[in-house]
Amino acid sequence: ISPDKAPASLMCVQDKIRAIRRAGADFVEVLDFDGDLRSLSAAQFITLLRDRYGVKALMMGFNHRFGSDRLPDISDYEKIGRGLGIEIFRAGELRDHTRHEPICSSSIRKALVSGDILSANDMLGYPYRLKGSVVAGKRLGRTIGFPTANIDTGDSNLLIPGSGVYAVDVILPDGKVSRGMLNIGRRPTVDHSAEAPLSVEVHVIGWNGDLYGKEIAVMFLDRIRDERCFTDLDALKKQLSADCQAAIVAC
């Protein structure tokens, strides 16, 4: 309804489609949530599903509501479904037994923003993934032996986890996977400003190819430490060596 106020996405549309197909779906269609669709009541939308797609059964999330009237209870949707010859199912609630709360996108976003990658991945059931194109940076990492690829996620609205250093697996353009250490933050050691733009940059361990202009993806495995400011580049280099070892043995 208000794209500028929508929460950040946990997965891009293309990856959602691939995931749904891997789960066994024969057909996937993304509906344009325009004014006409927004105005439909629950009954009108279920009727559309029957008439346009021949839907015989509809699965709803345990706390999901839809339609301009947002009916309050699953029984209301079941009643509409019976009148249209559609069986309505409600998915069971999944709970995070560590946090003692339902697993939902809001809980996952909260964990990612706080840097709690292990909890986020546990709730997701897979490592959180971020992808984008590699753009030119200042190339300062090369001068201390840790070249980095600066990732531009573009306008994908993908959620970027909280600032810090992370152990990641990097999916390279050729499909190969290499371990990496990734920094999210404002690079206080070299930029010296709290107003510096947020950067996402990854060092691919043991790899020296050219990635500029190519698309890569990173899968978050664990958080290594907070981002912090070092007194000089030698101190930064020493810490990066330790971070590299931590990334190698992560997970």
Where are these regions (language model features)?
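Residues at the C-termini of beta-strands that transition into short coil/loop
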Residues: 32, 92-94, 222
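A non-catalytic, amphipathic alpha-helix used as a structural packing/dimerization or gating element
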Residues: 15, 119-126, 235-246
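N-terminal alpha-helical segment
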Residues: 29, 101-104, 216
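Phosphate/ribose-recognition catalytic cores of enzymes acting on nucleotide-derived substrates
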Residues: 137-251
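Residue-level signal for inorganic ion chemistry
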Residues: 20, 58, 120, 168, ...
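N-terminal Rossmann-like or analogous alpha/beta NTP/dinucleotide-binding catalytic cores
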Residues: 1-84
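Glycine-rich, Lys/Arg-enriched anion-binding loops that position phosphate/diphosphate groups
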Residues: 81-186
